[in-house]
Structure formats: C-alpha cells, structure tokens
C-alpha cells in the first residue's frame, strides 16, 4: 500500500496538511509558552515586550502557514499562489459583498451582549496605553497573520480537498477550523461553524480567498478594538491627550 508512487494530488495534500500540522503545532505551543513570554518581558519594557511578542507570533504564523507551504508547493509541483485563490484583481461585486458582510459582522459584535467576554482575550497585545504606532502594528501583523491563515484554510486545504467533492471539502475544512478554535473557548468554536461555512462559500463563489481574508480581518480588528474600548485597564493615548486638553481649556485658570 505504501510502496505505490504518490500522484501529484496526493503530494499536494501531504505538503499542505503536513505543513499545517507542523506549523500550527509550533505556533500554538510557542504562543502559549510562559517561558517565552517571560523572556520577552525580561529583555524589554512591558509595552515593547507585548508588541514584539505578538508580532513574533503573527509573523511566525505568516511564515509557517503561508510562505513555507507555498514555497514547497511551487518548488515541488510548480504551483502558484493564483492556483489557491490569491488573485490580484479588482471586482466591484466582490468588493460590495465584502463591505456589506464586514459591516454586518462588526454590527453583530457591537450589539452582542456577551462582548464583555472579549476583554479576557483581546486585544492580544496587553498594552495599557495604546498609541497610533501600536494600532498600526496591530493592524499590519493581524493582516499578515490572517492572509496566511486564509491561504491555508480557504486556499491550500479547500483546493486539496475539492477532488473529494465540494461538500466533503467544506465539511472537513470547517471541522479543522472548529478544532483550531477550541482553545479559545466554546463560544468561538461554535461561531467558527457558520463563519467557516460563509467564508468557504465566498471563496468558492468568487474563486478567490480575498473575501474570506477581508471579512476575517474585519472580525479580528472589531474584536480587538471593541475589547480595547470595553477594558477599563486599557485606553488609546490619543483619547487621553484630547480629553486632558479639553479639561484644560474648560478650566477657569486657562
């Protein structure tokens, strides 16, 4: 059974799921490593440690789930990013769908009565006072992280599973997606089912991972900044400065 030569489809699947198994395991254990967290905080100030620590994790994910598998698939099978839905093209219909669904997702998070629970996990950079630079780093690193994430799930995995049929491909994709969210709690694991179905459908409908990426990015940033606003131990430095300026202008001594 194991002596038969692998077909190109089988080699593709081995590369993709092997890369995911190794890459996600590496990311997960480093992300949850107390010793690594302590090492960052010993070497840098608290704010700088949080920025560098989270940037390291997200760039690692970008490499192990995006860059490395793409290099292997390209070098061994001659595949390109376009084969997995990473197409650089503009589509007004696609842009409109992304915009509407992003507003819906952000609105759902905004009106969610349980959004206070987000404070325990988001934003992942545990910084007391956020500057514009911190916000920019958060957005850029989340973007790189989720680009690799969606390329792996809705690009590599979905394409590799399509020979077994659309429903099998989508079902397995969602199952793995849910498993990846279990460490974040029951609510996120359950929410991964409809969200996973939606982004799989968008990917198949448009033949591109960009709708899934932009929608996932909107979700991640909404979680981050709504949680930041709800956390009494965190604040935006610009708001504090503007508030202080307002109080000075209203003071009789001004």
Please give the residue ranges for each predicted region:
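Functionally important transmembrane alpha-helices
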Residues: 27, 32, 170-174, 178-180, ...
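Alpha-helical membrane-protein architecture signal
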Residues: 52, 132-144, 154, 168, ...
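Core segments of transmembrane alpha-helices
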Residues: 62-68, 144-154, 195
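Juxtamembrane helix-loop-helix connectors linking adjacent transmembrane helices
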Residues: 2, 41-54, 75-145, 159-163, ...
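Hydrophobic alpha-helical transmembrane segments in multi-pass integral membrane proteins
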Residues: 71-75, 141-146, 151, 203-215
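Membrane-interface helix/loop boundary segments of multi-pass membrane proteins
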Residues: 116-127, 148-172, 201-208
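Hydrophobic alpha-helical transmembrane segments
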Residues: 14, 18, 94-99, 136-139, ...
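Alpha-helical transmembrane segments in multi-pass membrane proteins
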Residues: 4-77, 81, 86, 94-97
């Amino acid at each position: 059974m194991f002596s038969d030569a692998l077909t190109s489809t089988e080699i593709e699947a081995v590369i993709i799921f092997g890369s995911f198994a190794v890459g996600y395991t590496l990311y997960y254990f480093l992300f949850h490593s107390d010793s690594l967290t302590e090492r960052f905080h010993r070497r840098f100030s608290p704010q700088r440690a949080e920025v560098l620590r989270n940037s390291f994790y997200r760039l690692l994910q970008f490499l192990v789930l995006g860059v490395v598998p793409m290099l292997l698939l390209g070098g061994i099978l001659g595949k390109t990013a376009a084969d997995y839905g990473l197409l650089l093209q503009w589509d007004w219909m696609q842009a409109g769908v992304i915009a509407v669904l992003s507003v819906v997702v952000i609105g759902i998070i905004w009106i969610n009565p349980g959004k206070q629970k987000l404070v325990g996990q988001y934003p992942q950079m545990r910084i007391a006072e956020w500057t514009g630079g911190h916000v920019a780093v958060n957005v850029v690193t989340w973007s790189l992280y989720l680009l690799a994430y969606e390329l792996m799930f809705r690009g590599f995995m979905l394409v590799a599973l399509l020979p077994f049929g659309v429903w099998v491909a989508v079902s397995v994709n969602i199952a793995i997606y849910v498993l990846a969210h279990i460490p974040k709690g029951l609510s996120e694991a359950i929410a991964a089912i409809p969200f996973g179905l939606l982004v799989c459908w968008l990917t198949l409908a448009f033949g591109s991972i960009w709708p899934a990426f932009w929608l996932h990015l909107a979700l991640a940033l909404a979680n981050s900044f709504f949680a930041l606003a709800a956390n009494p131990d965190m604040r935006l430095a610009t708001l504090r400065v503007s508030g202080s300026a307002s109080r000075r202008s209203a003071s009789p001594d001004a």
